[in-house]
Amino acid sequence: IYVGMEHSIGDTSFPLRLIRAQFPKLAVPPIGQPCYDSENRLVGIVLGVSRKGTCHLLPARAISFLATHPEAKRVRLGCLLDINSSTPVIEGLINGGPLARGGIQTGDILININDTPIRNYGDMLDATYYLTGDKPLSIEVIRGTQVVTSKGILPTQDPR
């Protein structure tokens, strides 16, 4: 049974939102097991299981992305967002980092990455997870009462 999406558990943050599913204790799938919906579509693969029957799944979209982009690097923007905030306000920037070089400022509200709407921290995680890192980014923020767009930002790349 689908419960929700989570970007962290306790002090552990994930590189993207994982699907949280609850199963009856006797029907908990093992780690590595694919899970399907009622229409037999892949939902994800089980990454972890708790004693209470809660599972975390790697979403099918992530599996597909990694299969089609095996060389993709992990993209980093060089910014800090409050993981618990309902608004994606840029709390800090790494000096000389991608967003700082693109003119983004502390206090800006992140609203789009390459035309993907950003409403919260989880949206930002997912948007950056599915980037390949080989193309410049377009970032849109709200600064005061203005919408500001910065194009041509080259992200930092790390191995996945």
Can you say where each PLM-predicted feature lies in the sequence?
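PDZ domains, with a preference for the canonical peptide-binding region formed by the helix
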Residues: 112-140
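Terminal peptide-recognition signature
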Residues: 2, 21, 35, 40, ...
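A generic structural motif
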Residues: 49, 116, 124, 154-155
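C-terminal cap/linker of serine protease catalytic domains
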Residues: 38-86, 126, 144, 158-160
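Conserved PDZ fold ligand-binding element
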Residues: 35-44, 99-122
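A structural signal for beta-strand boundary/capping segments at domain termini and interdomain linkers
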Residues: 147-149
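Active-site region of chymotrypsin-like
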Residues: 1-49, 75, 83, 87-92
